């Protein structure tokens, strides 16, 4: 009984520090599966989705969904419209979390939250990845410049009007310099498409 209580306290302490944790992280702390199940049943902790837990009174920010996805898909990178929205470049919030994985990676299936998978080859997958702390989780998100390059390079995935709006926001808000944006566009194969828009905005600015 005392041991079970100690294990229960371990769960609460871990979730207090990390905001959310996967089952294997909790079990690694010496907690049994039975104790974990009892903690959920008693309301001490909350099951967000399969294998992911948090405290019931946890204060989660608006981007906590990104932390959930990152926990469930550790190899993924937040991309496209979701990355643009995270950086404050567009007011159009995507209904799904856009996440990039490798060309040959296994495609994950989540019941919640809703995700949209994009496959990138190795150079594009690793380029411009930043780690942002969200709800205690280091979430890999593409930089402003990389997210813009992806948006212009993939017009079937991101509407051109959204890409242009995001580019203008990045420049006016100084989220990235024109040279940084241009370099990412060159490196990611989007320069030919982006160039006239970027040059017009910088000449007018």
Provide a role label for each language-model segment:
Residues 6-25, 29, 35, 40, ...:
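Nucleic-acid-binding surface
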Residues 1-3:
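Charged, compositionally biased N-terminal leader segments and the immediate start
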Residues 43-50:
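A short, conserved structural fragment
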